[in-house]
From Swiss-Prot:
GO terms for molecular function: DNA-binding transcription activator activity, RNA polymerase II-specific; RNA polymerase II cis-regulatory region sequence-specific DNA binding. Transcriptional activator. SUPFAM superfamilies: HMG-box. This is Transcription factor SOX-1. PROSITE patterns: HMG_BOX_2. The lineage of its organism: Eukaryota, Metazoa, Chordata, Craniata, Vertebrata. It is found in: Nucleus. The gene is SOX1. Residues 1-56 bind DNA.
Amino acid sequence: MVWSRGQRRKMAQENPKMHNSEISKALGADWKLLSDAQKRPFIDEAKRLRAVHMKD
């Protein structure tokens, strides 16, 4: 997920003892709190990257 890459890095730096599974759960909860408008740029970028990958 495009959004989670940056967020995961930030959360891991802020919480170095947090396990990856806990980070994933927290990121999932945070993603659900975003509005559709906030999610849109990340969804669009994921679609673009998918299209580029399929083209190769």
